[in-house]
């Protein structure tokens, strides 16, 4: 009798994806972030569902309903902070996951990579709309500033912005539709994540050496299931440390003030995970140029596979490219810092230089360095 795990139509899919899946024997902890992102998504959907049971998406009661969740609902405070800090953990895992893909050349799996880029955009949109829901000062002004960027689109811009707002400013209609989208998008993300995995399992995982691992595979279970469980425990440990000891560390104090259209906060800034893109947006004096740079700062990932000039897939044996990669990481940290600073000297100049360097590394320096390394191999 054959094992039901291998014959049952549903169990078979799970078996081929998480149990009998042949995996390279040498994948490191950098390959843990896919499963961690899955756990983050499940956690966000679970906590979000319980928050939605008590939240009201009306401008007059939204702020009070969040206060009510924290004060009156049983364990409402922990659900709310797990959801807010869960988003931060989600983005930390996302950035590390994308960074891993860049370092080890995983972008050569073009379908998986492109679905991943769509996932990144969708998660960013979801997080942005979620930030608007508590209807604090930063929620309101963040929504106003970011949606207003669309007015830079020639000819249809102004009409488009008012269509998204559902009126002449960010108001009741905007909040209601943002809540509706924020609720539905995580389920779309789940579907996209399955497509992401489907494409990945067509080719199999990459590995740190960047070479084929067809001759050296091990079953996913128990080897990588136990490794993933360790990663999940660490993730939960860090998340609960944040939630229970410093829940507001990554938030903005301005969001504890109810939204007031008549009073603009001195420094409008998004959540920390958008600051690098926000810094790139602000470093260009032209509105349309800034919006284009903002979109391209993420969309540039789509052309990375076409800029791969190296004879090797991974950066493991390419010290010059490694230096550039870590320079890029440092540059993104500088951009994140600049995004949270006021628009004044010297921050403007630093932001402009960091933005130029960001595009320079990805578009010019990395492909050139790869060619130099190819020639060094001949020596």
Curated annotation (Swiss-Prot):
<keyword id="KW-0496">Mitochondrion</keyword>
<dbReference type="InterPro" id="IPR036150">
    <property type="entry name" value="Cyt_b/b6_C_sf"/>
</dbReference>
<protein>
    <recommendedName>
        <fullName>Cytochrome b</fullName>
    </recommendedName>
</protein>
<dbReference type="GO" id="GO:0046872">
    <property type="term" value="F:metal ion binding"/>
</dbReference>
<dbReference type="Pfam" id="PF00033">
    <property type="entry name" value="Cytochrome_B"/>
</dbReference>
<dbReference type="InterPro" id="IPR048260">
    <property type="entry name" value="Cytochrome_b_C_euk/bac"/>
</dbReference>
<dbReference type="InterPro" id="IPR005797">
    <property type="entry name" value="Cyt_b/b6_N"/>
</dbReference>
<dbReference type="GO" id="GO:0006122">
    <property type="term" value="P:mitochondrial electron transport, ubiquinol to cytochrome c"/>
</dbReference>
<feature type="transmembrane region" description="Helical">
    <location>
        <begin position="178"/>
        <end position="198"/>
    </location>
</feature>
<dbReference type="InterPro" id="IPR016174">
    <property type="entry name" value="Di-haem_cyt_TM"/>
</dbReference>
<keyword id="KW-0349">Heme</keyword>
<dbReference type="InterPro" id="IPR027387">
    <property type="entry name" value="Cytb/b6-like_sf"/>
</dbReference>
<dbReference type="InterPro" id="IPR005798">
    <property type="entry name" value="Cyt_b/b6_C"/>
</dbReference>
<feature type="binding site" description="axial binding residue">
    <location>
        <position position="83"/>
    </location>
    <ligand>
        <name>heme b b562</name>
    </ligand>
</feature>
<dbReference type="GO" id="GO:0008121">
    <property type="term" value="F:ubiquinol-cytochrome-c reductase activity"/>
</dbReference>
<keyword id="KW-0408">Iron</keyword>
<dbReference type="InterPro" id="IPR048259">
    <property type="entry name" value="Cytochrome_b_N_euk/bac"/>
</dbReference>
<feature type="binding site" description="axial binding residue">
    <location>
        <position position="196"/>
    </location>
    <ligand>
        <name>heme b b566</name>
    </ligand>
</feature>
<comment type="subunit">
    <text>The cytochrome bc1 complex contains 11 subunits: 3 respiratory subunits (MT-CYB, CYC1 and UQCRFS1), 2 core proteins (UQCRC1 and UQCRC2) and 6 low-molecular weight proteins (UQCRH/QCR6, UQCRB/QCR7, UQCRQ/QCR8, UQCR10/QCR9, UQCR11/QCR10 and a cleavage product of UQCRFS1). This cytochrome bc1 complex then forms a dimer.</text>
</comment>
<feature type="transmembrane region" description="Helical">
    <location>
        <begin position="33"/>
        <end position="53"/>
    </location>
</feature>
<keyword id="KW-1133">Transmembrane helix</keyword>
<feature type="transmembrane region" description="Helical">
    <location>
        <begin position="320"/>
        <end position="340"/>
    </location>
</feature>
<keyword id="KW-0830">Ubiquinone</keyword>
<feature type="transmembrane region" description="Helical">
    <location>
        <begin position="113"/>
        <end position="133"/>
    </location>
</feature>
<dbReference type="GO" id="GO:0005743">
    <property type="term" value="C:mitochondrial inner membrane"/>
</dbReference>
<dbReference type="InterPro" id="IPR030689">
    <property type="entry name" value="Cytochrome_b"/>
</dbReference>
<comment type="function">
    <text>Component of the ubiquinol-cytochrome c reductase complex (complex III or cytochrome b-c1 complex) that is part of the mitochondrial respiratory chain. The b-c1 complex mediates electron transfer from ubiquinol to cytochrome c. Contributes to the generation of a proton gradient across the mitochondrial membrane that is then used for ATP synthesis.</text>
</comment>
<feature type="transmembrane region" description="Helical">
    <location>
        <begin position="288"/>
        <end position="308"/>
    </location>
</feature>
<keyword id="KW-0812">Transmembrane</keyword>
<keyword id="KW-0679">Respiratory chain</keyword>
<keyword id="KW-0813">Transport</keyword>
<feature type="transmembrane region" description="Helical">
    <location>
        <begin position="77"/>
        <end position="98"/>
    </location>
</feature>
<feature type="transmembrane region" description="Helical">
    <location>
        <begin position="347"/>
        <end position="367"/>
    </location>
</feature>
<keyword id="KW-0479">Metal-binding</keyword>
<dbReference type="Pfam" id="PF00032">
    <property type="entry name" value="Cytochrom_B_C"/>
</dbReference>
<keyword id="KW-0249">Electron transport</keyword>
<feature type="binding site" description="axial binding residue">
    <location>
        <position position="182"/>
    </location>
    <ligand>
        <name>heme b b562</name>
    </ligand>
</feature>
<feature type="binding site">
    <location>
        <position position="201"/>
    </location>
    <ligand>
        <name>a ubiquinone</name>
    </ligand>
</feature>
<keyword id="KW-0999">Mitochondrion inner membrane</keyword>
<feature type="binding site" description="axial binding residue">
    <location>
        <position position="97"/>
    </location>
    <ligand>
        <name>heme b b566</name>
    </ligand>
</feature>
<keyword id="KW-0472">Membrane</keyword>
<comment type="similarity">
    <text>Belongs to the cytochrome b family.</text>
</comment>
